Amino acid sequence: MDFELTPEQREIQAVAREFARAEIEPHAGEWDREHRFPAEIYPKLAELGLMGVCVPEELGGAGADFVSYVLVLEELSRADAGVGVTVAVHTSAVTLPILAFGTDEQRARFVPPLARGEVLGAFALTEAEAGSDAGSLRTTATPDGDGWHIAGAKRFISTARHAGTFLLFARTDTSEPGPAGVSAFVLDAEHVRVTRDEEKLGLNSTTTSDLVVDARVDGDRLLHEEGEGFHVAMATLDGGRIGIAAQAVGIAQAAFDAARAYALERRQFGSRLAELQAIQHKLADMSLEIDAARLLVLRAAWRKATGLPHAEEGAKAKLFASEMARRQTAEAIQIFGGYGYTKEFPVERYYRDAKITEIYEGTSEIQRLVIARSILGLRKQPVG
């Protein structure tokens, strides 16, 4: 068993870390305060190959593996969680599903612009009445000649305001309740209309929006087979959760870095905070849990990269990493004391950003269901 990263993985990690420290971290606080989407960052990431890390080179990507991709997500999220999730949705939830389930023509048409960062991707599954119960969606796609007429509304769609390509799910068979009648479609920005942006607790450098769709699309916009959209969605989430787990690790690592530096500098009771046993214990626990979460993430990413079933491992990584990030960002605030509760230091932002990792791409409660059903043999793990 080799715990060392490959030279290529280390190189990609270093590129992402250097860019994040130079181009993202110095501005993250400003983006958060101003609720600004830093559109200028994504073409720069694309120039480095970081918008299509694990996309084959012949389709415009860097040709690296999924482990390299989660390493990139951790580094980006360490600097700014909003940038991290934008890249995560773009890659895990849009580009890779098209790569996995699309025809040769669909891959050639849609993947290169995504991998080159010419357009951003958005994943449109959630609806007002279909959150964790994704099989209850009401958006419909009805046959219209040789195409489809898609009509409905979506809720909480990350990056919708800025996306050019949407992976959208609609019901093609209204006689089939639950997930059986759901299909997946690849749409362009012209097919949807963003109606409002959410005001959120965190992730203020990205947008989360409601949208409506009322458009006719050609038949070649159907991804995979009719009625197989729920399978596409679940396989997408199985991989996407690994990316969100990496995001959570990045946020927690940033909080630890800040708390450690503060403890080494701040003096109380005649000594540095770092010399107080209570603070040492907090930092030790933070480091321990971050390392444990990172190992779970890398195991899940390795299994996906090698084509092994990874639903259970991805759920474990996301569950542990997200809850760990919420705990440890709170501990970072505690180490800072009153200063941690102010906007003067970034730890309050890390705390706000961490919370969502327990909710999107499957809540902690859903992750526990996925894990339980897997260990009890009640769920077949898709490979994709």
Predicted features along the sequence, with ranges:
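Short Gly/Pro-enriched turn/cap motifs at secondary-structure boundaries
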Residues: 114, 129-132, 156-159, 175-176, ...
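A short, Trp-centered hydrophobic/proline-enriched beta-strand micro-motif
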Residues: 117-125
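Short glycine/proline-enriched turns and hinge-like loops at secondary-structure junctions
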Residues: 64-65, 133-135, 159-164, 178-181, ...
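Alpha-helical interface subdomain recognition
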Residues: 1-79, 83-89, 101-106, 113-117, ...
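Structural signature of FAD isoalloxazine-binding scaffolds in flavoprotein oxidoreductases
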Residues: 63-73, 133-137, 215-217
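A short, charged helix-loop
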Residues: 209-235
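A short core secondary-structure module
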Residues: 151-194
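Flexible, small-/acidic-enriched active-site or ligand-binding loops
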Residues: 136, 190-218
